[in-house]
Amino acid sequence: MCCLMTILFMGGWLPPAKRIHHTKHKPAMRHHDLPEFMKFLLKRDTTPARALEFQILTIARPTEVQFAEWPEINLDEGTWTIPGSKMKNRNPNELHVVPLVPRAIEILRSMPQSGRYVFPGYQGKEQISENALNNTVKAIHQESLKSGGKGFMDPRYNKIACAHGMRSCFKNFAAARTDFDDVVSELSLAHLDS
């Protein structure tokens, strides 16, 4: 069988094997540390802080929040419709509709609607920077340490949590603290193989 497979492959009758995709996990805080983190986050009155809070409430990827545009938002229906072209591994014609909780709608209503992007950047940039959300997490971590707290570390990797790690935090919370089937959290995270 091995020789037959080699002959078929070498002769061009079999497609090349797919490369193995190794997932690189992003540092995430423990889900029971999130309430303390939110206390620090809610004290901040900056666009990146509101963007990070919105990301936590919607469980979106940081880049989806960074590039969220006003035409994708329907405040009356309480939805954010993300085109597949902006999502990881999605068909460009596919849509992902995110239901918005009241606080997420409140955040959106507080943002200026004068530009293309929901979360505008500083110094004339159209959208917040790629690092804005992560820098906010790092600043909150430092603020916690300065006030005698333990900060917001990923215990497995011994690294400061990052914005993308909020998705893992949600996944862990859903598994540990709810009775929902795993597929519900997977669909919330817009994972394709759900």
Residue ranges and their predicted role:
Residues 2-68, 76, 94, 126, ...:
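Basic, Lys/Arg- and aromatic-enriched nucleic-acid-binding interface segment
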Residues 3, 7, 186-194:
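Substrate-binding beta-hairpin/strand module that engages nucleic acids
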Residues 31-44, 75-140:
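Basic, alpha-helical nucleic-acid-contacting "clamp/cap" segments
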Residues 39-49, 110-117, 122-125, 134-187, ...:
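Short, basic (Lys/Arg/His-rich) helix/loop patches that form interaction surfaces
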